[in-house]
Amino acid sequence: MPLRPTPPALPFEYPAHLRAQAEAAPRAPGVYFFYAQGDSMPLYIGKSVDIRSRLLAHLRTPEEARMLRQAQRIEYQQTAGEIGALLLESRLIKELQPLKNKRLRRQRRLCSLRMHQDKLEIIDTTALAEGPQLYGLFRSRRMAIEALMLLADEHRLCHSLLGIEPANTKGCFRAQIRKCAGACRGDETHAAHTERLLQALAHWAVHRWPYPAAIALHERHGQMEQYHVVDNWRYIGTYASEAEARLAPTLPPQSFDADSYKILVRPVLFESARVVVLS
């Protein structure tokens, strides 16, 4: 039976009242907001290194077209660079929960994996501390176990040695069907299994904080400057001057946030922005 031809997409033009607002936006980094008529809460929050260009490009999918039909006004907030835009967007989406954005919520609990006395453990990592290397940032213990099971399948690791299921002196069922290399029944030494496990976990390693104190990541766009203060991967806040950044408050260890870590890890490790050590 021949396939039905796909109907042509209906033409859609950028609403005139929104186009005028978009064209008036700056060609600068920052965060922008779409609002429906009469609403004080945004429909959608986005970010870009060029607010105007990104606003005018919001016609790429049917979902974006539908959102533009609902929107009545656009607002924006400039930042001094991409890092500031990413941090601001992440914070505002968590706080405001816009209808058209993927839901982001601050995680009150995070889990990671670590090796302790030759055993793999799942621990709470809402607060990062000095100690053994941590692997992965998971939103629940269940998600950590699911990820570990996929890793076990890929590398023929033993569920019992990973702590996923009880040990069996005769070896696990997965060893019988050759999904486990057999460390549970003597086909492989425990040391060899641990070495393979650590190699498999390496790409999940949580980077250690590389500075002796808090730092500020400095960004500038035109006359605008911002200093993003970070301490042990915890985002403290954004300030307009280095002097203000040096007066930034400290935060409790429980303020660690996985989304901020993912935003900050590259600029901190590779210094894509100027780093000021706040000792």
Predicted features along the sequence, with ranges:
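Conserved catalytic/ligand-binding micro-motifs in nucleotide and anionic cofactor chemistry
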Residues: 1-43, 47-279
